[in-house]
From Swiss-Prot:
Cofactor (UniProt): Mg(2+)
Species classification: Eukaryota, Metazoa, Chordata, Craniata, Vertebrata
Protein name: MAPK/MAK/MRK overlapping kinase
Family membership: Belongs to the protein kinase superfamily. CMGC Ser/Thr protein kinase family. CDC2/CDKX subfamily.
Signal sequence residues: none
Record bears the keyword Transferase: yes
Reactions that this protein is recorded to catalyse: L-seryl-[protein] + ATP = O-phospho-L-seryl-[protein] + ADP + H(+); L-threonyl-[protein] + ATP = O-phospho-L-threonyl-[protein] + ADP + H(+)
Localization of this protein: Cytoplasm; Cell projection, Cilium; Nucleus
Source species: Homo sapiens (Human)
Protein kinase domain span: 4-285
Length: 419
């Protein structure tokens, strides 16, 4: 961390604390997520899903950009250097007397659905979508904190007590870890309501109260849904019939299209719940799609790539130090679980092969194509072999310095047979 100066503390969680840092190389400000856990080897770092996921998902305009990963083998400390955002959604709405305009709400929710569509198409689900993990910078929204993410192809059951209680889907509460990527849409629906009303939708004080709060609003589900959940839980349960007050009774300032999408996102049955790519086509986002289409047309006329990226030239650039040298490089499911085509999909996220004490710096890679989208022939991203840079090569002003630790560049994620 000798290349960064601590400016102040942003926040702290169970497993990490986040600091505002200034780079001594480029003068830019970053968010440093310092892990509280100590790591004994590169293999342990390899197994961190958060790093694997961010490497696969970056770059995307609605996913937090990972700038650098710094691992100190001697102390076992690990830090993730990410782009610095202005605030999270919780901070945005906290203390507000009046809700945001529906246009602003629509703009933010469209970007949140874009981020979820991107991660789901790339075989990952977040599992902890909540206001604190959704970051804002001016009008750009980005999903962050992938510490709880999983591969959609990994074997169930998953961890039961995942996600923050208020945003936890019924299948997470009522089964022994048998849930899918659809849980992210439930959580996003809860965030949707909270942005619009400035109040949490289901503020349960414990697990039982959480289910009760859900039933108070939505009503108890059909018996066939409860029966399906019971098959995935050792303990039996029954609930008294509740009709539910309904979401419209809790709000008066939301349009019919807004309420329609909100209901679709918090459908009790995950099989009936809307998927992210379907949400993006909902009538509520009609104006957003038109705006995006016009912007795409302008980019094509100007000769720019078809996939616009949020305009952040500084935070989207990475500087890789090699003892005095700086190199600047640009960073660039259907309703049910997607059907397999061709070779079997990977069951877990790919591991990054590293060696020695390293500073892992991101660098440009082509925009990732979906592992679930058409035209992939069922193939998944692969990793190129690592290129290691010996630390022995120094420029003249540094000959009297001690040998630096070995540095490795992370490989670009590429797809065989892709575009």
């Amino acid at each position: 961390m000798k290349n960064y100066k601590a400016i102040g503390k942003i926040g702290e969680g169970t497993f990490s604390e986040v600091m505002k840092m200034q780079s001594l190389r480029d003068g830019n400000y970053y968010a440093c997520k310092q892990m509280k856990q100590r790591f004994e080897s590169i293999e342990q770092v390899n197994n961190l899903r958060e790093i694997q996921a961010l490497r696969r998902l970056n770059p995307h305009p609605n996913i937090l950009m990972l700038h650098e990963v710094v691992f100190d083998r001697k102390s076992g400390s690990l830090a993730l250097i990410c782009e610095l955002m202005d605030m999270n959604i919780y901070e945005l709405i906290r203390g507000r007397r009046y809700p945001l305009s529906e246009k602003k709400i629509m703009h933010y929710m469209y970007q949140l659905c874009k981020s979820l569509d991107h991660i789901h198409r790339n075989g990952i689900f977040h599992r902890d979508v909540k206001p604190e993990n959704i970051l804002i910078k001016q009008d750009v929204l980005k999903l962050g904190d992938f510490g709880s993410c999983r591969s959609v192809y990994s074997k169930q059951p998953y961890t039961e007590y995942i996600s923050t209680r208020w945003y936890r889907a019924p299948e997470c509460l009522l089964t022994d870890g048998f849930y899918t990527y659809k849980m992210d849409l439930w959580s996003a629906g809860c965030v949707f309501y909270e942005i619009a009303s400035l109040q949490p939708l289901f503020p349960g004080v414990n697990e039982l109260d959480q289910i009760s709060k859900i039933h108070d609003v939505i009503g108890t589900p059909a018996q066939k849904i409860l029966t399906k959940f019971k098959q995935s839980r050792a303990m039996n349960f029954d609930f008294p019939f509740k009709k539910g007050s309904g979401i419209p009774l809790l709000t008066t300032n939301l349009s019919p299209q807004c309420l329609s999408l909100l209901h679709a996102m918090v459908a009790y049955d995950p099989d009936e719940r809307i998927a992210a790519h379907q949400a993006l086509q909902h009538p509520y986002f009609q104006e957003q799609r038109k705006t995006e289409k016009r912007a795409l047309g302008s980019h094509r006329k100007a000769g720019f790539p078809e996939h616009p990226v949020a305009p952040e030239p500084l935070s989207n650039s990475c500087q890789i130090s090699k003892e005095g040298r700086k190199q600047k490089q640009s960073l660039k499911q259907e309703e049910d679980r997607p059907k397999r085509r061709g070779p079997a999909y990977v069951m877990e996220l790919p591991k990054l092969k590293l060696s020695g004490v390293v500073r892992l710096s991101s660098y440009s890679s082509p925009t990732l194509q979906s592992v679930l989208g058409s035209g992939t022939n069922g193939r998944v991203p692969v990793l190129r072999p690592l290129k290691c840079i010996p630390a022995s090569k120094k420029t003249d002003p540094q000959k009297d310095l001690k040998p630096a630790p070995q540095q490795c560049r992370l490989p670009t994620i590429v797809r065989k047979g892709g575009r």
